[in-house]
Amino acid sequence: MALLRFDKVSFAYPDAGKRALDQVSFSMEEGEYIVVCGESGCGKTTLLRQAKPEITPAGAGDGTVYYREQPLSEVPELTSAMEIGYVQQNPDNQIVTDYVWHELAFGLENMALPTSVIQRKVSEMASFFGMEEWFRKKTSELSGGQKQMLNLASIMAMNPKLLILDEPTSMLDPLAARNLLDTVARINRELGVAVLLCEHRLEDVFQRADRVLLMKQGAVLADDTPENLTFTLQKDPTASRIYLGLPGAARIFGELQQKGVCPTNKKLPLSIRDARHVLKELDLPFEKVKAEPEKRTEAAKSNKEKPALEGKELWFRYDEKGKDILRGLNLSVQRGELLALLGGNGAGKSTLLRILCGLKKPFRGKVKKDKEMRLAMLPQSPQALFVYDSVWEDLLDAAKQGRGARFVDKVQGNAEAAAERAREVAAKLELTDKLTSHPFDLSGGELQRAAIGKLLLQDADILLLDEPTKGLDAYLKQELAGILKKLTEEGITMLMVTHDLEFAASYADRCALLFDGRITSEEEPHAFFTGNRFYTTTAGLIAEGYLPGAITCGEVIAGCEKAYAKKM
């Protein structure tokens, strides 16, 4: 008997022009681990929410979702609440109490369980998740990673049979994300809890999954094992844009197979360990070649020039007796440069952006920028940017406020020209069919794109971007990178806070690490990522010891090709 089964499920949001889900059918057994992937806006979140009655969106639907062969609509509320757990994308959206221990007990208290049972379950979960040191902390004092772990633990205290996770790592730093996914895998493996997980970052989940559901435009395009799906997409990368988001190991050796460097009869590796094993088996003379960095933009100016934006000796704390978040921090960004700022959850990256744009004042230190330079900021929560009832109205308003044309050659300053600019940006960010939608009806990735579009239309000289790639599929990340590169070539300055190491390694001019309230490292990407164990890329870990200095998939592929040529 299947644990969960979708039978020809279709769904459309109110006033939507097309279905968000179209005849979706699949089933999952007890203890299975299924990853749902697909391009941004393809219906992943909508699908997951159909399996959790309490948060199923309003709209018109067909077909039936079954839980243990009983229509989900007929499953008792108590059963659904206890047996089907759901972890959302934003950790803050799910926490409802002030203290960690109370959050763990909240669901159990609502089930009216005896005090002794609640205490036992809370103790058990705190021990399993390693929460002893922060068990009595306020939830407001937790890092993003701790908050998401608390959400997961609170759900597991209810003893669910099915755990649903909607991009649970999208707002977490690399270490916290890996820790969370390791815990989910442990729950699946040791406790037998079925996992239905949606992710754009497939690097750490593909190798753990039993099956992968690949979605496209609301339908299931493929339902297969990770290995088989990888092989299928490698043979036909045009079948889905998700090919660009496959684990780095698979993309590297898929390309090498096509180029004749790697035998085609071998399975594509999905993990770093397997990739290094294949690299060793190739027995190429890597000592005769040197990894060559991929070309970067030439827009970043010499460090001898006056910085476009500078923070000097910045100190900040949220209250007088509180902990210092920034401690004598110094940072400068040159004109036409893209600087990626990395660091753990709670390190102070978003706080720094707010200080640099004037939303918060440091209690010591100065922020310097040319008074004539316009500055715009993309916040971590893009909802804050939208004030109208449609995406089009928001974009058009931003275009009217802009002073120039970054995407249209000639602007007359009139309404028609502003509309043309708004349409072009919408097309570039694949929002044309969403222009009549209310911003809050968009998926997470679509809302992020709309926020980026609104920011670009402001025509600012300095852009502060807080997690701009959050919710974007790999293809849209490439599109965004192209836009950012065009802007830096025009002299636009950018400071980007990101947890996306691959994006930073591929497109940033410099990378900086914020730790303990200070910038502890500030280097060109290759110098920054090479030699690291955790703050580095998949390609860098695969190439370590073979192609020192290679940090992107393209650089590893190029290095292997050169070594293969030397061998021949």
Enumerate the predicted regions with their spans:
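Catalytic Walker B motif of ABC-type/P-loop ATPase nucleotide-binding domains
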Residues: 163-166, 463-466
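ABC ATPase nucleotide-binding domains
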Residues: 236-305, 535-568
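Conserved ABC ATPase "signature" region
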Residues: 116-134, 396, 413-434
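ABC ATPase NBD coupling module
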Residues: 71-85, 368-378, 384, 388-389
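H-loop (His-switch) and adjacent beta-strand-loop-beta switch element
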Residues: 212-225, 511-524
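Conserved ABC ATPase signature
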Residues: 138-142, 438-442, 446
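H-loop/switch region of ABC-family ATPase nucleotide-binding domains
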Residues: 199-200, 498-499
